[in-house]
Amino acid sequence: MLFFDKNKRILKRYSKIVEKINQLDQSMRKKSNEEIVSLSSELKERVNSLEDADRNLVEAFALVREAARRTLGMRPFDVQVMGGIALHEGKVAEMKTGEGKTLAATMPVYLNALIGKGVHVVTVNDYLARRDALWMGPVYLLLGLRVGVINSLGKSYEVVWKDPSLVEKAIKENWSVWPQEFDGEILKEEQMNKEALNAFQVELKEISRKEAYMCDVTYGTNNEFGFDYLRDNLVLDYNDKVQRGHFYAIVDEADSVLIDEARTPLIISGPSKESPSTYRRFAQIAKKFVKDKDFTIDEKARTVILTEEGVAKAEKIIGVDNLYEPGNVSLLYHLINALKALHLFKKDVDYVVMNGEVIIVDEFTGRLLPGRRYSGGLHQAIEAKEGVPIKEESITYATITFQNYFRMYEKLAGMTGTAKTEENEFVQVYGMEVVVIPTHRPMIRKDHDDLVFRTQKEKYEKIVEEIEKRYKKGQPVLVGTTSIEKSELLSSMLKKKGIPHQVLNAKHHEKEAEIVAKAGQKGMVTIATNMAGRGTDIKLGPGVAELGGLCVIGTERHESRRIDNQLRGRAGRQGDPGESIFFLSLEDDLLRIFGGEQIGKVMKILKIEEGQPIQHPMLSKLIENIQKKVEGINFSIRKSLMEMDEVLDKQRSTIYSLRDQILLEKDYDEYLKQIFEDVIGTRVEEFCSGKNWDLEGLKNSLSFLPRDLFEFDGRRFESSEELYEYLFNRMWEEYQKKRQEIGEEYSKVIRFLMLRIIDEHWRRYLEEVEHVREAVQLRAYGQKDPIVEFKKETYLMFDEMMRRINDTIANYVLRVVKVTEKDEKEAKEELGKIRLVHEEFNLVNRAMRRAMEKGKKKGGSHGLGKIRVKR
């Protein structure tokens, strides 16, 4: 009850704002087109912040309403204006199917776009992004805003006037799609001013991705906005970034994107280009290395460290001058992995070999983990060691969940037909209240109580009977199934009965919208998986309202009431008649797992015969309570995963901020000074802070740096501070020497090296984190809190990674030397490989790669043609 009281209070406040907007209606109608354009320019001058937007809401909303009337022949209803206010306030607007969410969004989109930081309108597929941008484009264009569209094929567009000179004429001569004399609520197509409608036509013009984001409004899918963010944080030049920040987003189908897919990680990955022969080659090379002479083993960290002798041996065997050259980094990793496979990972302890496959053994339970693989090329190294077929390695370069991506926005809003049941989660995770917007016309759909059968066989037979009955009288039927498999089963049963029907599975393509739109025609039977066709209205064909409207049949209850409500909501749009009914069985997953035995007992007591259902409001209530219980369980799972993700999110921000700092910096002296201080300071503190100094241990701990850097030559130091000063000055002198030696290219080289080092360490860290995430879940059995354990481990791991990044940067910048002109060609070839590898970072999948291949510009040189790194 409290929810509805609160909702009523919010709607009462909105009604007062709508009244003020309505009061401006007549004055807006009297304005000429030129005055409308001019008022929009004035508002743009006035609105520079969110506070300014709040102050100018009434005038801006009234202006958009008038622009929509003139360009589209559509006037947002009062309830749509209410929805727009909720969206402007950063809430989730629950608006039923067919209530015009797309038009409602134009008002808050326009108002917030005036601030000039860019507004993102997020849809669930490319088709809807393109459709909505073209459909609403004329409103924004008349008001002087630029509209961009991005899609998953790497293409980007701007919405532009089809005939700018005709638009100019239409503005000058005051053309309007909505005739001045028409005072009705809804303008029918035949009543529209065709001359104006023709003038205000728009089309798409291809532009760059960056330009699409520079537009005032950008339409796109949740996937693409997320992927562009990840790709932006893999660039080697700041100017290659396409997004300009995360200011305000309106998410369509918010429940689907922000809750159902909240934990879905967006992953930029690519198959490794390594051939199996590389792994086999290094498996052989590793056998030639002698433990404690060529390498040492750190059992605790489960890693291998090459000695100076080992590095020299590797360079000789592999046939390279310098193992530390940027282009040779992968060779070093191959060697380390081969040595780890040979000396650290034991057959029948860490893994077993079965049917030509290397299968990991769970270290906690001793069980086999088929399908699970070691990351970073280690699994392939073990396969090479064991002589079994080597499977392709997949490399993760960057990842983020939708939850964490959308929480970056300064202001976030959502709209959907079903959100009320998830308000608790919207509030706790995103800080967004849900406002239920009333329908423009009263809802008259008839929702029947659930029918429960003993078996699935009985249930499906009755569903087919029900479909046949309604098909014979011409009433359209939409059947919602929970899986593709179930939709195909039902389809084959209907074929046997000779009932024509269309099947729609949840694979988004443009044809889907056509199928869904046809579902309301007389005699049409459509089978669809629950999520298919969201965003497209089912309009009733001629004579269908008299037959009772669209009949929606649910074939089982979903774990979430919201998904069931979405299915019901396909019928009864905009006050149309309609029906909904769910057919269930005790064998359905939900009832079988969560309490179907209670219903089974009732059926036995009532002596329900085979093929006969049980139907009662109390039963529907019982099923709803089961769903509430499951929703609670699922929410708590998502919440605990979110707490783990928050740790990773902060770490991601740290890494991406560090990248930005490096990309924007022109001189790296100050940054490198901090790194040297850290590298020297931590070692001096560890080995020489007390009375017992371990100078040999100190030298060994710095052995990854050039060897001749720290020769003490019998020097004595009075304090650890003096020792620190000496070591730091030696490093700094060496750095300055290198800097002068290389000259003006040095900064460019250092930037490239540092970014590569950070990206590589972060990539490997992400893989390690996934292993920790899996491992801590098992510790719950030992009465340990997985979240506390995860936080503890990842904090330590992150600190360790940052230390390794600093060590590696110090190592590389002190080894850079200028190469002679004769080596230039060879060095450029190495660079070509690096650049291609980095381009791989920017690609999501093969299809996208092919689409981008044609128009791809050649990447410019990173200025590394004359550089190599020397040991």
Swiss-Prot record:
Keyword ATP-binding: yes
Gene Ontology biological-process entries: intracellular protein transmembrane transport; protein import; protein targeting; protein transport by the Sec complex
Keywords, in A-Z order: ATP-binding, Cell inner membrane, Cell membrane, Cytoplasm, Membrane, Nucleotide-binding, Protein transport, Translocase, Translocation, Transport
SUPFAM superfamilies cross-referenced by the UniProt entry: Helical scaffold and wing domains of SecA, P-loop containing nucleoside triphosphate hydrolases, Pre-protein crosslinking domain of SecA
UniProt protein name: Protein translocase subunit SecA
Localization (cell): Cell inner membrane; Cytoplasm
E.C. number: 7.4.2.8
Encoding gene (name): secA
Entry superkingdom: Bacteria
Chief localisation class: membrane
Enzyme class: translocase
Assembly: Monomer and homodimer. Part of the essential Sec protein translocation apparatus which comprises SecA, SecYEG and auxiliary proteins SecDF. Other proteins may also be involved.
